[in-house]
Amino acid sequence: MARVTVSVLKDKKKRKEKISMLTAYDYSLAGMVDEAGIDMILVGDSLGNVVLGYDNTLAVTMDDMIHHSKTVVRASKNAMVVGDMPFLSYHISKKEAVRNAGRFIQEAGCSAVKLEGGSERVDTVKAILDAQIPVMGHIGLTPQSVHQFGGFKVQGKDLETAKKLVEDARALDQAGVYCIVLECVPSELARRVTEEISVPTIGIGAGPYCDGQVLVINDMLGMFRGFTPKFVRKFANLEPLIMEALKNYKAEVEAGTFPAEEHCFTIKEEVLDRLY
């Protein structure tokens, strides 16, 4: 089976088939996500929160993203791997944006990049597309703008911001993005956007009417001890299982019951006798 492509995703929207996406940041989990048949793996700058321990995503660098993206690409065979462009990697100039987007493709082996912002990012999006690099848009709550928004808040609840969201979606669609993430917006507004634009929408906290869904894998597996957003469903609760395993390991090491005989290698007695 070949990797999922832009055309595959667009065909899914036409057939009204839902698109699945999850984040992943390491070889082990990325391999499992791929084997499960998830359409896209986003190497998200959310690794700043769930992997690197920052309060937000703003401290994540291009080198951080390339390092983790390489790992995810090596682990996956079928999913489209999308590299998330971090803060300031596409804000300074179009030239720098293209160079950084190119690193995700050339160095890491990703199939596409994602960047945040609406109408104000159209020229940047077009420049990256001119370099033959597929671009995923991201509007609504854009975490790299957390200080501008005054925190992590639902977007598009009043007429002015709802109109802005629709305009941004139209602008990105016309610019040529292959899909758009809608984050933390009212469900009915997300439905309007999804019905209006030609490319798939991927929701995170945007209700059931989007063409697809994405979650942070650490959240949906119940592995992250930090804040869990309202829109997250824990499909597993692994933290207590992991904690139990860690405590059992400690107890068995201290009691001398691990490693047991079945975990050990042997050597012939005559070899030992000839050591000294």
Swiss-Prot record:
Domain of life according to the entry: Bacteria
Record pathway: Cofactor biosynthesis; (R)-pantothenate biosynthesis; (R)-pantoate from 3-methyl-2-oxobutanoate: step 1/2
Subcellular location: Cytoplasm
EC number(s) recorded for this UniProt protein: 2.1.2.11
Entry annotated with the keyword Ribosomal protein: no
Cofactor info, note text: Binds 1 Mg(2+) ion per subunit.
InterPro entries the UniProt entry points to: Pantoate_hydroxy_MeTrfase (IPR003700), Pyrv/PenolPyrv_kinase-like_dom (IPR015813), Pyrv_kinase-like_dom_sf (IPR040442)
A GO BP entry: pantothenate biosynthetic process
Positions that bind Mg(2+): D45, D84, E116
Matching CDD domains: KPHMT-like (cd06557)
A molecular-function term among this protein's GO annotations: magnesium ion binding
Reactions performed catalytically: 3-methyl-2-oxobutanoate + (6R)-5,10-methylene-5,6,7,8-tetrahydrofolate + H2O = 2-dehydropantoate + (6S)-5,6,7,8-tetrahydrofolate
Gene3D superfamilies referenced in this protein's UniProt entry, alphabetically: Phosphoenolpyruvate-binding domains (3.20.20.60)
Binding site for 3-methyl-2-oxobutanoate: D45, S46, D84, K114
Signal peptide location: none
A GO term from the CC aspect: cytoplasm
Positions annotated as active site in the UniProt record: E183 (proton acceptor)
Family: Belongs to the PanB family.
HAMAP family recorded: PanB (MF_00156)
Role, per record: Catalyzes the reversible reaction in which hydroxymethyl group from 5,10-methylenetetrahydrofolate is transferred onto alpha-ketoisovalerate to form ketopantoate.
Subunit structure comment from the entry: Homodecamer; pentamer of dimers.
Protein's name in the database: 3-methyl-2-oxobutanoate hydroxymethyltransferase
Source organism of this protein record: Syntrophomonas wolfei subsp. wolfei (strain DSM 2245B / Goettingen)
Gene encoding the protein: panB
